Protein backbone atom coordinates (compact mmCIF):
# COMPACT_ATOMS: atom_id res chain seq x y z
CA UNK A 1 0.00 0.00 0.00
CA UNK A 2 1.17 3.54 -0.75
CA UNK A 3 0.37 6.54 1.45
CA UNK A 4 1.23 9.98 0.10
CA UNK A 5 1.31 13.36 1.81
CA UNK A 6 1.00 15.92 -1.01
CA UNK A 7 2.38 19.29 0.06
CA UNK A 8 2.86 22.67 -1.56
CA UNK A 9 2.05 26.35 -1.35
CA UNK A 10 -1.29 27.82 -2.38
CA UNK A 11 -1.85 27.32 -6.11
CA UNK A 12 1.11 24.98 -6.51
CA UNK A 13 -1.11 22.20 -7.90
CA UNK A 14 -1.66 19.85 -4.93
CA UNK A 15 -5.28 19.20 -5.85
CA UNK A 16 -4.52 19.07 -9.56
CA UNK A 17 -1.89 16.32 -9.31
CA UNK A 18 -4.21 14.42 -6.95
CA UNK A 19 -7.04 14.64 -9.49
CA UNK A 20 -4.53 13.39 -12.06
CA UNK A 21 -3.87 10.31 -9.90
CA UNK A 22 -7.64 9.85 -9.49
CA UNK A 23 -7.96 9.83 -13.28
CA UNK A 24 -5.17 7.24 -13.58
CA UNK A 25 -6.90 4.99 -11.05
CA UNK A 26 -10.30 5.33 -12.76
CA UNK A 27 -8.74 4.37 -16.10
CA UNK A 28 -7.18 1.33 -14.37
CA UNK A 29 -10.65 0.30 -13.12
CA UNK A 30 -10.02 1.02 -9.43
CA UNK A 31 -12.41 2.34 -6.80
CA UNK A 32 -12.18 5.99 -5.68
CA UNK A 33 -13.29 7.78 -2.50
CA UNK A 34 -12.67 11.49 -1.96
CA UNK A 35 -13.93 14.67 -0.32
CA UNK A 36 -13.25 16.63 -3.52
CA UNK A 37 -16.07 17.87 -5.73
CA UNK A 38 -15.30 16.14 -9.03
CA UNK A 39 -16.74 16.53 -12.52
CA UNK A 40 -16.01 13.08 -13.87
CA UNK A 41 -17.26 13.85 -17.37
CA UNK A 42 -14.51 16.46 -17.75
CA UNK A 43 -11.65 14.09 -17.01
CA UNK A 44 -10.00 13.86 -20.46
CA UNK A 45 -9.14 10.15 -20.23
CA UNK A 46 -12.59 9.25 -18.85
CA UNK A 47 -15.03 11.31 -20.91
CA UNK A 48 -18.79 11.69 -20.85
CA UNK A 49 -19.52 8.19 -22.16
CA UNK A 50 -17.77 6.20 -19.40
CA UNK A 51 -20.10 3.72 -17.70
CA UNK A 52 -17.83 2.00 -15.17
CA UNK A 53 -16.20 4.58 -12.80
CA UNK A 54 -16.86 3.83 -9.12
CA UNK A 55 -16.38 7.11 -7.25
CA UNK A 56 -17.66 7.85 -3.74
CA UNK A 57 -18.04 11.36 -2.33
CA UNK A 58 -17.41 11.43 1.41
CA UNK A 59 -17.95 14.39 3.79
CA UNK A 60 -15.39 17.20 3.92
CA UNK A 61 -14.24 15.97 7.34
CA UNK A 62 -15.30 12.33 7.47
CA UNK A 63 -16.13 10.52 10.66
CA UNK A 64 -15.28 6.92 11.42
CA UNK A 65 -18.76 5.87 10.27
CA UNK A 66 -18.13 7.54 6.89
CA UNK A 67 -14.85 5.68 6.45
CA UNK A 68 -16.48 2.40 7.40
CA UNK A 69 -19.25 3.09 4.86
CA UNK A 70 -16.86 3.18 1.89
CA UNK A 71 -16.02 -0.49 2.49
CA UNK A 72 -13.05 -2.21 0.92
CA UNK A 73 -11.02 -0.67 -1.86
CA UNK A 74 -9.71 -3.97 -3.22
CA UNK A 75 -10.87 -7.52 -2.55
CA UNK A 76 -7.83 -9.15 -4.15
CA UNK A 77 -4.21 -9.42 -3.01
CA UNK A 78 -2.96 -7.45 -6.02
CA UNK A 79 -2.03 -4.04 -4.60
CA UNK A 80 -2.00 -2.54 -8.10
CA UNK A 81 -5.81 -2.82 -7.93
CA UNK A 82 -6.07 -0.94 -4.63
CA UNK A 83 -8.70 1.77 -4.37
CA UNK A 84 -7.61 5.38 -3.88
CA UNK A 85 -8.76 7.57 -0.99
CA UNK A 86 -8.01 11.29 -1.53
CA UNK A 87 -8.57 13.71 1.36
CA UNK A 88 -7.98 17.46 1.10
CA UNK A 89 -7.40 19.98 3.92
CA UNK A 90 -5.87 17.40 6.24
CA UNK A 91 -3.83 19.92 8.21
CA UNK A 92 -6.61 20.21 10.78
CA UNK A 93 -6.66 16.44 11.32
CA UNK A 94 -3.04 15.67 11.88
CA UNK A 95 -1.83 18.56 14.03
CA UNK A 96 -0.70 17.74 17.55
CA UNK A 97 -4.03 18.63 19.18
CA UNK A 98 -6.16 16.54 16.79
CA UNK A 99 -3.74 13.61 16.85
CA UNK A 100 -4.18 13.30 20.62
CA UNK A 101 -7.94 13.90 20.49
CA UNK A 102 -9.73 10.78 21.73
CA UNK A 103 -12.67 11.42 19.37
CA UNK A 104 -10.35 11.32 16.36
CA UNK A 105 -8.52 8.21 17.51
CA UNK A 106 -10.83 5.71 15.71
CA UNK A 107 -10.24 7.60 12.43
CA UNK A 108 -6.48 7.50 12.93
CA UNK A 109 -6.70 3.78 13.70
CA UNK A 110 -8.62 3.29 10.44
CA UNK A 111 -5.87 5.07 8.49
CA UNK A 112 -3.22 2.92 10.14
CA UNK A 113 -5.07 -0.23 9.03
CA UNK A 114 -6.22 1.00 5.60
CA UNK A 115 -3.77 -1.35 3.89
CA UNK A 116 -5.77 -4.37 5.00
CA UNK A 117 -8.87 -2.82 3.43
CA UNK A 118 -7.16 -2.33 0.07
CA UNK A 119 -6.84 1.46 0.03
CA UNK A 120 -4.04 3.73 -1.15
CA UNK A 121 -4.30 7.17 0.47
CA UNK A 122 -3.40 10.70 -0.61
CA UNK A 123 -3.46 13.37 2.11
CA UNK A 124 -3.27 17.01 0.99
CA UNK A 125 -1.60 19.48 3.38
CA UNK A 126 0.03 22.84 2.74
CA UNK A 127 3.14 21.98 4.71
CA UNK A 128 4.39 18.80 6.34
CA UNK A 129 5.36 20.69 9.50
CA UNK A 130 1.64 21.08 10.29
CA UNK A 131 1.38 17.32 10.73
CA UNK A 132 2.14 15.86 14.15
CA UNK A 133 5.53 14.16 14.34
CA UNK A 134 4.00 10.82 15.38
CA UNK A 135 1.56 11.00 12.46
CA UNK A 136 4.45 11.65 10.06
CA UNK A 137 6.37 8.70 11.42
CA UNK A 138 3.35 6.39 11.24
CA UNK A 139 1.79 7.42 7.92
CA UNK A 140 4.19 9.49 5.79
CA UNK A 141 5.58 6.70 3.63
CA UNK A 142 5.90 9.09 0.66
CA UNK A 143 5.89 12.88 0.60
CA UNK A 144 5.13 14.77 -2.62
CA UNK A 145 6.45 18.31 -3.07
CA UNK A 146 4.44 20.20 -5.71
CA UNK A 147 5.87 22.95 -7.90
CA UNK A 148 4.52 25.05 -10.77
CA UNK A 149 7.10 25.58 -13.49
CA UNK A 150 5.43 28.72 -14.85
CA UNK A 151 6.26 30.49 -11.56
CA UNK A 152 9.97 29.85 -11.97
CA UNK A 153 12.19 32.43 -13.66
CA UNK A 154 14.87 31.09 -15.97
CA UNK A 155 18.29 32.45 -15.02
CA UNK A 156 19.74 35.07 -17.40
CA UNK A 157 17.21 34.36 -20.18
CA UNK A 158 14.23 35.30 -17.98
CA UNK A 159 16.00 38.43 -16.71
CA UNK A 160 16.91 39.50 -20.25
CA UNK A 161 13.32 38.94 -21.40
CA UNK A 162 11.99 41.05 -18.50
CA UNK A 163 14.39 43.89 -19.30
CA UNK A 164 13.30 43.95 -22.95
CA UNK A 165 9.54 43.45 -22.56
CA UNK A 166 8.93 44.64 -19.01
CA UNK A 167 7.03 41.45 -18.15
CA UNK A 168 7.83 37.97 -16.88
CA UNK A 169 8.83 35.41 -19.47
CA UNK A 170 5.84 33.07 -20.06
CA UNK A 171 6.53 29.41 -19.37
CA UNK A 172 4.32 26.33 -19.85
CA UNK A 173 1.89 25.74 -16.99
CA UNK A 174 3.34 22.41 -15.96
CA UNK A 175 2.74 20.99 -12.48
CA UNK A 176 5.46 18.74 -11.07
CA UNK A 177 5.14 16.54 -8.00
CA UNK A 178 8.49 15.28 -6.71
CA UNK A 179 7.89 12.10 -4.69
CA UNK A 180 10.29 11.45 -1.82
CA UNK A 181 10.48 8.13 0.00
CA UNK A 182 10.28 9.38 3.59
CA UNK A 183 9.32 12.59 5.39
CA UNK A 184 12.59 14.45 4.75
CA UNK A 185 13.46 16.57 1.72
CA UNK A 186 16.79 14.75 1.69
CA UNK A 187 15.03 11.40 1.26
CA UNK A 188 15.59 9.64 -2.08
CA UNK A 189 13.37 10.64 -5.01
CA UNK A 190 11.33 7.66 -6.21
CA UNK A 191 9.28 9.25 -9.01
CA UNK A 192 7.92 12.48 -10.47
CA UNK A 193 4.30 13.27 -11.28
CA UNK A 194 3.90 15.56 -14.30
CA UNK A 195 0.55 17.09 -15.25
CA UNK A 196 -0.45 20.00 -17.47
CA UNK A 197 -3.10 22.17 -15.92
CA UNK A 198 -5.44 22.99 -18.78
CA UNK A 199 -6.95 19.56 -19.34
CA UNK A 200 -7.74 18.97 -15.63
CA UNK A 201 -8.97 22.37 -14.40
CA UNK A 202 -12.57 21.64 -15.41
CA UNK A 203 -12.55 18.23 -13.74
CA UNK A 204 -12.94 19.56 -10.18
CA UNK A 205 -14.17 22.62 -8.29
CA UNK A 206 -11.09 24.81 -7.90
CA UNK A 207 -12.95 27.09 -5.45
CA UNK A 208 -14.32 24.36 -3.21
CA UNK A 209 -14.64 25.44 0.44
CA UNK A 210 -14.46 22.75 3.12
CA UNK A 211 -16.80 22.87 6.08
CA UNK A 212 -17.21 20.96 9.33
CA UNK A 213 -20.99 21.27 8.87
CA UNK A 214 -21.21 19.22 5.68
CA UNK A 215 -24.81 18.00 5.66
CA UNK A 216 -24.57 15.05 3.27
CA UNK A 217 -23.28 11.60 4.04
CA UNK A 218 -21.39 9.24 1.78
CA UNK A 219 -22.85 8.93 -1.70
CA UNK A 220 -21.78 7.64 -5.09
CA UNK A 221 -21.27 9.84 -8.13
CA UNK A 222 -23.34 8.96 -11.16
CA UNK A 223 -21.22 7.62 -13.99
CA UNK A 224 -20.49 10.21 -16.70
CA UNK A 225 -22.70 8.31 -19.12
CA UNK A 226 -25.74 8.51 -16.83
CA UNK A 227 -25.22 12.19 -15.99
CA UNK A 228 -24.16 13.49 -19.42
CA UNK A 229 -23.41 10.89 -22.07
CA UNK A 230 -26.94 9.60 -22.60
CA UNK A 231 -28.20 13.14 -23.22
CA UNK A 232 -25.60 13.90 -25.86
CA UNK A 233 -26.99 14.57 -29.32
CA UNK A 234 -24.73 14.22 -32.37
CA UNK A 235 -24.25 17.44 -34.32
CA UNK A 236 -26.20 17.80 -37.53
CA UNK A 237 -24.68 19.12 -40.76
CA UNK A 238 -25.70 22.72 -40.09
CA UNK A 239 -24.12 22.72 -36.62
CA UNK A 240 -20.92 21.16 -37.97
CA UNK A 241 -20.71 23.83 -40.68
CA UNK A 242 -21.26 26.54 -38.06
CA UNK A 243 -18.46 25.14 -35.89
CA UNK A 244 -16.22 24.88 -38.96
CA UNK A 245 -16.79 28.58 -39.72
CA UNK A 246 -16.02 29.51 -36.11
CA UNK A 247 -12.74 27.57 -36.09
CA UNK A 248 -11.75 28.85 -39.54
CA UNK A 249 -12.34 32.41 -38.37
CA UNK A 250 -10.39 31.77 -35.18
CA UNK A 251 -7.38 30.19 -36.89
CA UNK A 252 -7.60 31.96 -40.28
CA UNK A 253 -4.30 33.83 -39.91
CA UNK A 254 -2.38 30.75 -38.85
CA UNK A 255 -4.03 28.71 -41.61
CA UNK A 256 -3.20 31.31 -44.28
CA UNK A 257 0.39 31.48 -43.09
CA UNK A 258 0.70 27.67 -43.21
CA UNK A 259 -0.84 27.53 -46.69
CA UNK A 260 1.55 30.25 -47.87
CA UNK A 261 4.59 28.37 -46.59
CA UNK A 262 3.35 25.10 -48.11
CA UNK A 263 2.66 26.75 -51.48
CA UNK A 264 6.08 28.40 -51.58
CA UNK A 265 7.81 25.15 -50.71
CA UNK A 266 5.83 23.20 -53.34
CA UNK A 267 6.53 25.80 -56.04
CA UNK A 268 10.26 25.89 -55.27
CA UNK A 269 10.40 22.09 -55.35
CA UNK A 270 8.56 21.81 -58.68
CA UNK A 271 10.50 24.58 -60.43
CA UNK A 272 13.89 23.49 -59.16
CA UNK A 273 16.06 22.51 -62.16
CA UNK A 274 16.95 18.87 -62.22
CA UNK A 275 20.68 18.09 -62.26
CA UNK A 276 21.98 16.90 -65.60
CA UNK A 277 23.13 13.32 -65.67
CA UNK A 278 26.20 12.86 -67.76
CA UNK A 279 25.88 9.87 -70.01
CA UNK A 280 28.97 7.81 -70.57
CA UNK A 281 29.16 6.78 -74.22
CA UNK A 282 30.60 3.34 -74.59
CA UNK A 283 33.05 3.02 -77.47
CA UNK A 284 34.50 -0.01 -79.18
CA UNK A 285 38.23 -0.38 -79.46
CA UNK A 286 40.57 -2.54 -81.47
CA UNK A 287 42.63 -3.86 -78.58
CA UNK A 288 44.80 -5.92 -80.95
CA UNK A 289 46.51 -2.66 -81.89
CA UNK A 290 46.72 -1.36 -78.28
CA UNK A 291 50.00 -1.19 -76.43
CA UNK A 292 50.75 -0.23 -72.85
CA UNK A 293 52.42 3.17 -72.94
CA UNK A 294 52.88 3.41 -69.14
CA UNK A 295 51.72 1.65 -65.98
CA UNK A 296 51.58 2.57 -62.32
CA UNK A 297 51.07 0.57 -59.15
CA UNK A 298 49.61 2.18 -56.00
CA UNK A 299 49.38 -0.34 -53.15
CA UNK A 300 46.77 -2.81 -54.42
CA UNK A 301 45.49 -0.68 -57.30
CA UNK A 302 46.93 -0.38 -60.79
CA UNK A 303 46.64 2.25 -63.48
CA UNK A 304 47.53 1.90 -67.16
CA UNK A 305 47.83 4.30 -70.05
CA UNK A 306 47.26 2.71 -73.46
CA UNK A 307 48.20 3.92 -76.95
CA UNK A 308 46.16 2.94 -79.99
CA UNK A 309 47.38 2.60 -83.58
CA UNK A 310 46.92 6.35 -84.19
CA UNK A 311 49.00 7.30 -81.17
CA UNK A 312 45.99 8.40 -79.07
CA UNK A 313 46.40 7.86 -75.34
CA UNK A 314 43.58 6.22 -73.36
CA UNK A 315 43.81 5.58 -69.61
CA UNK A 316 42.37 2.59 -67.77
CA UNK A 317 39.94 4.75 -65.74
CA UNK A 318 38.07 5.79 -68.89
CA UNK A 319 37.79 2.17 -70.00
CA UNK A 320 36.38 1.12 -66.62
CA UNK A 321 33.75 3.88 -66.78
CA UNK A 322 32.62 2.42 -70.11
CA UNK A 323 32.10 -1.01 -68.56
CA UNK A 324 35.43 -2.67 -69.30
CA UNK A 325 37.05 -4.71 -66.54
CA UNK A 326 40.84 -4.83 -66.27
CA UNK A 327 42.70 -7.72 -64.69
CA UNK A 328 46.29 -7.12 -63.66
CA UNK A 329 48.83 -9.71 -64.79
CA UNK A 330 52.00 -7.68 -64.43
CA UNK A 331 53.09 -4.11 -65.07
CA UNK A 332 53.55 -4.89 -68.75
CA UNK A 333 50.57 -7.20 -69.26
CA UNK A 334 46.85 -6.66 -68.58
CA UNK A 335 43.63 -8.45 -69.51
CA UNK A 336 40.73 -6.30 -70.78
CA UNK A 337 37.29 -7.91 -70.71
CA UNK A 338 33.77 -6.86 -71.60
CA UNK A 339 30.99 -9.34 -72.17
CA UNK A 340 32.37 -12.33 -74.05
CA UNK A 341 35.37 -10.38 -75.36
CA UNK A 342 38.69 -10.83 -73.60
CA UNK A 343 41.92 -9.27 -74.92
CA UNK A 344 45.50 -9.30 -73.65
CA UNK A 345 47.42 -6.03 -74.04
CA UNK A 346 51.16 -5.80 -73.53
CA UNK A 347 53.91 -3.25 -73.65
CA UNK A 348 55.42 -2.38 -77.01
Swiss-Prot record:
Tell me a GO cellular component.
host cell membrane
Alphabetically, which GO biological process terms does the record hold?
A: viral extrusion
The listed locations are: Host membrane
Q: Which domain of life is it from?
A: Viruses
Q: Which residues cross the membrane?
A: 254-270
The principal localisation class reads: host cell
**How does the protein's chain sit in the membrane according to the entry?**
Single-pass membrane protein
| Pfam families assigned | Zot
Q: Where does ATP bind?
A: 8-15
Main role? Isoform G1P plays an essential role in phage assembly. It is required to increase the number of adhesion zones between the inner and outer membranes of the host cell. The extrusion of neo-synthesized phages occurs at these adhesion sites. May be involved with G4P in creating zone through which the phage assembled and extruded.
What family does the entry list? Belongs to the inovirus G1P protein family.
- Protein name (Swiss-Prot/TrEMBL): Gene 1 protein
Please tell me the species this chain comes from: Enterobacteria phage f1
